[in-house]
Amino acid sequence: MAVQFILCFNKQGVVRLVRWFDVHSSDPQRSQDAIAQIYRLISSRDHKHQSNFVEFSDSTKLIYRRYAGLYFVMGVDLLDDEPIYLCHIHLFVEVLDAFFGNVCELDIVFNFYKVYMIMDEMFIGGEIQEISKDMLLERLSILDRLD
């Protein structure tokens, strides 16, 4: 499996989005412990002088990017190619930005169901499904009109 989980949290560690594609989803306590550990690991890093890739466990590495006050994190297999996932984090944020018109944390909080809809269009079962921003926005506008 490629993507094991996708997280989004703010500088204070408040989780705004979480989607598990592996065994963490079945154990809430294990999920909470993993999120706390990920937050401590990422928030303590010097983002100007350290890379966006961190080894997390024996089988998982974290790929993250900070946008304003939000961290977007993907947990991927240890042997996967980091830049590809970093580009997909950026694509996800670009699609959010285009869909909401200059997205902010409050958009994610109050429209979380739309954000999960966007995530579902991009990732299915931990695999990347769509890489075209235009195609994603076209599909999302159709789905949004159904609302």
UniProtKB/Swiss-Prot annotation:
Keywords: Cell membrane, Coated pit, Endocytosis, Membrane, Protein transport, Transport. This is AP-2 complex subunit sigma. It is found in: Cell membrane; Membrane, Coated pit. It holds the Pfam family Clat_adaptor_s. Present with 1390 molecules/cell in log phase SD medium. Belongs to the adaptor complexes small subunit family. It comes from Saccharomyces cerevisiae (strain ATCC 204508 / S288c) (Baker's yeast). Adaptor protein complex 2 (AP-2) is a heterotetramer composed of two large adaptins (alpha-type subunit APL3 and beta-type subunit APL1), a medium chain (mu-type subunit APM4) and a small adaptin (sigma-type subunit APS2). Interacts with APL1. GO terms for cellular component: AP-2 adaptor complex; cellular bud neck; clathrin-coated vesicle; intracellular membrane-bounded organelle; nucleus; prospore membrane. Its main location: membrane. The keyword Membrane applies. Component of the adaptor complexes which link clathrin to receptors in coated vesicles. Clathrin-associated protein complexes are believed to interact with the cytoplasmic tails of membrane proteins, leading to their selection and concentration. It is a peripheral membrane protein. It comes from the Eukaryota. PROSITE patterns: CLAT_ADAPTOR_S. One of its GO terms (biological process) is endocytosis. PANTHER family: ADAPTOR COMPLEXES SMALL SUBUNIT FAMILY.
